[in-house]
């Protein structure tokens, strides 16, 4: 099947008045880079949106293409990077180059109360943002379900819904849904 790829930087989407922000690493090569919408059209999206739907944070359990009718409820999804990093391993320069876009999206969401960071790099990107822009001090260790209160926000660490993490059972629906429900209780 021949498809035309979006092939441009991918920005966040969702409820601009949302109280929950989900932060991922980067657009998937054959997901968001193909479709133009973050967490759309790949295995990570399949797992994530099944969990978001069961948690009451989306109107449907699938995210396949831009015109599939998907709507997030009180939630906005963004990325640490806007383009696919080679071998899914971003360099420090790539993260720094995208930090301005990350900052703009975080600042755009005025009602944010909870951030769920999907994976260590997304988590570290959030912490770095608050250290640089809000004077945050200290060290913060990533782990699934860790919770930190930072500048009036709560930040959760969550294992990324990658096929590797799902197939090895590092993350499963029960764990992810439980974490999203914990996030909802804080809003």
Give, region by region, the residue ranges found by the protein language model.
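A polyanion-binding, active-site-adjacent surface
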Residues: 1-187
């Amino acid at each position: 099947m021949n498809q035309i790829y979006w092939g441009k930087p991918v920005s966040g989407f969702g409820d601009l008045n949302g109280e929950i922000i989900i932060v991922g690493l980067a657009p998937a090569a054959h997901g968001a880079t193909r479709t133009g919408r973050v967490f759309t059209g790949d295995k990570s999206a399949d797992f994530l949106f099944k969990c978001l739907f069961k948690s009451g944070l989306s109107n449907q359990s699938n995210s396949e293409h831009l015109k599939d009718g998907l709507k997030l409820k009180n939630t906005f999804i963004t990325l640490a990077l806007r383009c696919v990093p080679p071998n899914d391993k971003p360099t420090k320069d790539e993260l720094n180059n995208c930090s301005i876009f990350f900052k703009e999206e975080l600042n755009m969401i005025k009602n944010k109360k909870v951030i769920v960071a999907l994976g260590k790099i997304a988590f570290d990107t959030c912490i770095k943002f608050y250290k640089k822009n809000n004077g945050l001090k200290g060290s913060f260790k990533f782990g699934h379900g860790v919770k930190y209160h930072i500048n009036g926000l709560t930040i959760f660490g969550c294992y990324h819904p990658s096929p590797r993490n799902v197939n090895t059972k590092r993350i499963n629906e029960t764990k992810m849904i439980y974490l999203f429900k914990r996030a909802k209780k804080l809003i």
